[in-house]
Amino acid sequence: MTNPQPPSRRVAVSPPFDLAKTVAPASWARGRWPNVDARRGAFVWVGWEANQVVWRSVRQIDARTLEIIGSGSSERDVHWASAVLGASAAIPVFDDPILAALARKHPGLRAWSAGSLFEGVVSSIVGQSISVAAAATTERRLCERFNDGLHIDGRQFWPPPRPEQLASSSAAFVRETGVTTKRAEALVAVGTLFASEPTRAAFDTDPVAAVQQLASISGIGPWTIQSALLWGVAAADAHPTRDVALLRAARVHYPVVSDLKDLDRLAEQWKPYRAWAARLLWLDLFGYDGANATGDA
């Protein structure tokens, strides 16, 4: 389905704000993510709003202004920019001299996320122990399985599955997207856990309250939970323990880090902003749209 071009509207942001750096993770999979992409100065997002599939395409006009087009409600643009682009939360002050230097180097970085703990959990289950590119490809197959796509800006996008869609599916059906049986079972269980709208809202408001219930699901461990908190709702201190990509990024700046145990020990010094530290290190390694990256996710 091709969408007509709706009128644009503008949203104010507080500087420093850098859209390209903020949504850099969307560009690391080189167009493979099913519902987001960052290229040619624009960030495209497809998701759910008031039980409908909507889309937004965002460009940064100047230091204080974002231009948005799309079918999403203009009345929700400010909320969306806060929830998804992290527009209301700037980089914290770090005592660590390396992180402080990276924060000065990337002052406009904000905490981009899905804006939904459920979506963060789904992505993290799919992404267990595989590369960003492989995770994006598998997640696209999962999204294709449940919903029709939208053609936007020259490519096809698909919204994430709804909790009730996963809850009503068999593990065998989900398994056909390419995930393992254990992960398929975990995805169905997560759909069941989040199927109640009040539960979803409560978990998004207080995501830590969901941790114990998520940990009880077979196939969901500490890395999955922490990644879901980081990428789902931009939790400031989420730490994806044993994350190989973070180890690569940390080694560039911290010679004392040789293995994952060293990384976890170092991360203790980053509290209560371990997620921000990870974002800065990843950004410095993998780069962003319009800049040369030094690594490959």
Where are these regions (language model features)?
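HhH-family (HhH-GPD) DNA N-glycosylase catalytic core used in base-excision repair
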Residues: M1-A297
